[in-house]
Amino acid sequence: MKRSMYAGRVRKEHVGQEITLKGWVGRRRGLGGLIFIDLRDREGIMQLVINPESVEAEVMAKAESLRSEFVIEVTGTVVEREQANDNIPTGAVELQVTSLTVLNTAKTTPFEIKDGIEASDDTRLRYRYLDLRRPEMLNNFKLRAAVTHSIRNYLDDLEFIDVETPMLTKSTPEGARDYLVPSRVSKGHFYALPQSPQITKQLLMNAGFDRYYQIVKCFRDEDLRGDRQPEFTQVDLETSFLNEVEIQDIVEGLIAKVLKDTKGIDVTLPFPRMAYDHAMNFYGSDKPDTRFEMLLQDLTELVKEVDFKVFSEAPVVKAIVVKGAADSYSRKDIDKLTDYAKQFGAKGLAWVKVDKGELAGPVAKFLTGITEKLTASLQLEDKDLVLFVADELEVANNTLGALRNRLAKEQGLIDESKFNFLWIVDWPMFEWSEEEGRYMSAHHPFTLPTEETAHHLDGDLAQVRAVAYDIVLNGYELGGGSLRINQKDMQEQMFKALGFSAEDAHEQFGFLLEAMDYGFPPHGGLAIGLDRFVMLLAGEDNIREVIAFPKNNKASDPMTQAPSTVASAQLEELALDITLENE
């Protein structure tokens, strides 16, 4: 029979109606000769009642045979419950079953199909189709669908054109490693799966499309963490003839619409703007979480005269104050914080506690001459904990920034109900790579330098600033964008600054440089990480929770066993020979 409605949508207004439902058995229980079944489908749970006095013996026998996750079809009459269950939307009614059909049986599942399970990540991924049956997972994907629907409606209304760009493209140096696809036709040659549609969307601007968007899969072969996957989805935008503020206005409107449509939240516009240098110096991060204070404070000049070489001879001394936390952290706890600080390059972590107006701790004796100034500078109060890092500026900022985030979580300083957006602007164009021994693009090599600093491309690259902007939400980089270079001579100059020879630049990017001979318009854009955005809206802490079939931390799929070996005949057809290094 045809299903009448979803089980989770049956309500009091359906009382007296005969309906047919289909779904999975959540649980079965007997009471006083009656059998009660929780029938689950994607919209929720409905209680079924099977009374031996009102059904045939065959129906009763089928009901007694049911186990969790059997797939069934039932027909019956909706009645009002004698005792309502206010914990579920269908709790005012139940279905008095008259017929029952078992559509399929099920083995005992490796974990219960319910929220809050304790199964390991790999077990959940191994049986992902079961994991996705759980209501909290299903709700995440309903949210994701609502987000993409809202995005498409917004961009369609602004006359953006949805264009699909190639999945098989050319390998170009963009930062992370490419996933390579060997060509059978052109043996010895490889496609790359795109890390982003960056160049192709710029070429669409040269084609006169004016406003492009795409919700697109991207691929990066990089080390994984909670908010990264080897394949991910981004909301990709590009526009012609707009400046950075106009592009930011469009993105702010998009985000405001998504939050209103999906969460019922009104977002205050415009978003705050913060310079990159300010973010690093006061938050220790280029993606600061502004839901709490605990700012980094520079004490370099104040501690120059103390009799403590770790401070007096350090390039920079910075500190954070954890208000009222002195009694929360024992020496052993601070040792753990010190070990954590060393992960970010710090040599150690100095600390003092405020105890009745006096400083206590290993370095307190060195600070007696500046106690009053230090107390005033840091606005210290009783029971405060002060953590110091003395090192190079970058190390001090990164270390204290990481500690700031960790301590805020441990101290419960974060209001999880807040959605704090901001723009990080005034970016450096380049960042120095110790590993490579050269400057690298902070974003990508197509970013437009500011008019005031472009002349440094032939000199001090540290002075070049970019017309770039990242959007940050609650300490996560939600997306990044920039105005792009549209003049051939400047693009060639940029490649040269990055260490490309003229031959290498034309080998890698000749098609883009050639396109710049044909009236390339001023343009710019942005990409938002869709997985990360939905993760934050859903209140999750790992993007695996909002990706249907993600990989684990080894970039593997425990369900399909991908990646896997392939037959030697396939390798021969591709003219490939695999040599494995000894482990």
Swiss-Prot record:
Its EC number is 6.1.1.12. Keywords: Aminoacyl-tRNA synthetase, ATP-binding, Cytoplasm, Ligase, Nucleotide-binding, Protein biosynthesis. InterPro entries: Aa-tRNA-synt_II, aa-tRNA-synth_II, aa-tRNA-synth_II/BPL/LPL, Asp-tRNA-ligase_1, Asp-tRNA-ligase_1_N, Asp/Asn-tRNA-synth_IIb, AspRS_core, GAD-like_sf. GO terms for cellular component: cytoplasm. ATP binds at R220, D221, E222, Q229, E477, G529, L530, D531, R532. It is found in: Cytoplasm. Its main location: cytoplasm. L-aspartate binds at E174, R220, H443, R484. One of its GO terms (molecular function) is transferase activity. It catalyses: tRNA(Asp) + L-aspartate + ATP = L-aspartyl-tRNA(Asp) + AMP + diphosphate. The keyword Transmembrane helix does not apply. It is an enzyme of class 6 (ligase). One of its GO terms (biological process) is aspartyl-tRNA aminoacylation. Residues 198-201 are annotated as: Aspartate. Homodimer. Belongs to the class-II aminoacyl-tRNA synthetase family. Type 1 subfamily. Catalyzes the attachment of L-aspartate to tRNA(Asp) in a two-step reaction: L-aspartate is first activated by ATP to form Asp-AMP and then transferred to the acceptor end of tRNA(Asp). NCBIfam families: aspS_bact (TIGR00459), PRK00476.1 (NF001750). This is Aspartate--tRNA ligase. It comes from Streptococcus suis (strain 05ZYH33).
